[in-house]
Every structure is written in structure tokens, then in C-alpha cells.
Amino acid sequence: KTTLLSNANPQQKDYNWGTIELVDFTSLDGKALKGLLVKPEDFDPKKKYPMLVNFYERSTDNLFRHRAPRAERSSINYSFYTSRGYVIFNPDVEYRVGYPGESAYNCVIPGITSLIEKGFVDTNNIGVQGHSWGGYQIAYLVTKTNIFKAAESGAPVPNMISAYGGIRWWSGLSRQFQYEHTQSRIGGTP
């Protein structure tokens, strides 16, 4: 017999919170990769689900990180989407210096394909979302594939060459350090 001890947070009954698991796949260059798959709590592998792809470098480090159900300025609200029957995929991306966009393609697309092969992804309803560095990668991806029904590329720098001499906000530094040697990984002076 189950005894209810408390009715704290009754608003939570309106959410299908979702579960998260680690998935394995192989990049187009043969590297073993991982990603996070977020599914509605009532997930049925025989059903088809719309899928949102959301990524920013490495996501698997956040396997045990709780995401609060709130609006974010640069990401999606995970509980909002799982409560509405979406699965969410966060693939890890491993970069090759000099080829940041191609690196994203080589990791993200085979990750999506591996989930499609499992049979529960509605291939007519796959969306992708990313912000800043993720936005740049999405701007690249949508020029290389038609797999996405919808894409949101927030605050991307789609042309690093034209922004190369700009000033990185809050730092006073030229963006060239960021583009050549840190996150953007173009690997040298254009």
C-alpha cells in the first residue's frame, strides 16, 4: 500500500519531466562518440516522436545536471518539450582545428542517424537549436543537410572573417584570439 506523505509542489503534475540517458554513436571520421538523449517519462519505443537537437561542444559532462524548468535566453526549456512529447538529443562534438563547421557535421548528423535507426524518431519533425557557438554550427549545418524541418541559430557569427578584427565583448580583446586559438578553432590567420 502506498501512502502519500505530502502534496508539496502540486504544479509538478502538469509536467512529463523526462528521463535522460547516455547514447553511443560513431562520427563520420570513425570516432566513438556519446550524446545525451532526453525522453518523456512515458516514452514508448514503438511510437514516433518529434526530436529537437541541441548542442554546444560537450554535453555528456552534464548527464547528472538538473535542468530547472524555466525559460532560458540561449537554450531550450527541456521540461517544456518533454512534456509535449519531444525527445531531445545533445550530441558531443569533437573538433578538428581548421574545420569547425565540418567537425560539427561529422559528429551531429551520424548521431541523429543512429537515433533514427532505432525507430522512434519522426523523421519529418526534427528541429535543431543552438546559440552563439552552437548558432554558428547550426548556420553551417543547414547549408549541408535537409534533415531539419526547423532550425534556430541564435546569435551566430556566420562570417568569422568579417568579425575577425572586432572586439570581444567584456574583454577589450580582438576576436582573433578566439577565432584562431580557442573555441572557434580556425587554426590560423585567415
Regions found by a protein language model. Give the residues of each.
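Non-catalytic accessory segments flanking enzyme active sites
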Residues: 1-47, 71, 76
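Flexible, glycine-rich phosphate/dinucleotide-binding loops
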Residues: 2, 11, 44, 61, ...
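Extracytoplasmic/periplasmic beta-strand context in beta-sandwich domains
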Residues: 3, 49-51, 124
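Active-site donor-binding loop signature of nucleotide-sugar glycosyltransferases
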Residues: 7, 27, 57, 93, ...
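Hydrophobic core residues within well-ordered beta-strands of beta-rich domains
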Residues: 31, 49-51, 87
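Short, surface-exposed "cap/lid" segments of acyl-processing enzymes
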Residues: 43-48, 52-72
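Active-site-proximal cap/loop segments of hydrolase catalytic domains
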Residues: 54, 67-190
